[in-house]
């Protein structure tokens, strides 16, 4: 923190802040959700982080963003894993179901192999749509190769 912000913060202060925030984070992560979301975007973002040993490693942050029936965006969940995979997405979808989500009308996802099958196993009536951003990125590869 001192390098980034110019402020020195003691280990006791960091522990006190963490102790106050963790219960709120746990409550947010386990809160009940709406039963239906018309649209849900699911994607993982990869970050370099420092692990317990002080080594720089890459971790996947799984993000689930939904549009509720009133048209408002809601961050439904954030999950951390070593890497992105359909099996972990299945556990994310199961968590959403356990927290009250009964149906997703449209799931916007990247082209990860096995991801549509994971969605269909938990939400069999959900239409799966490849995210427009991912469609453009994938198309550009072929355009550049053709030039």
Residue ranges and their predicted role:
Residues 21, 28-29, 136-139, 143:
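Generic structural signal of hydrophobic/aromatic residues within well-ordered alpha-helices
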Residues 57, 141-147:
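Short, surface-exposed amphipathic charged segments that create phosphate/polyanion-binding patches used
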Residues 123-141:
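Inter-helix linker motif
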């Amino acid at each position: 923190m001192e390098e980034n912000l110019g402020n020195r913060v003691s280990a006791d202060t960091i522990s006190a802040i963490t102790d106050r925030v963790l219960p709120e984070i746990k409550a947010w992560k386990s809160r009940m959700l709406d039963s239906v979301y018309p649209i849900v975007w699911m994607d993982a973002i990869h970050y370099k982080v420092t692990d317990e040993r002080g080594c720089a490693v890459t971790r996947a942050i799984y993000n689930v963003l939904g549009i509720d029936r009133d048209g408002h965006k809601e961050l439904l969940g954030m999950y951390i894993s070593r890497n992105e995979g359909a099996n972990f997405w299945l556990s994310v979808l199961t968590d959403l179901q356990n927290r009250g989500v009964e149906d997703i009308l449209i799931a916007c996802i990247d082209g990860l192999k096995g991801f549509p099958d994971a969605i269909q196993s938990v939400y069999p009536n959900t239409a799966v749509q490849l995210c427009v951003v991912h469609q453009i990125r994938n198309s550009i590869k072929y355009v550049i190769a053709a030039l």
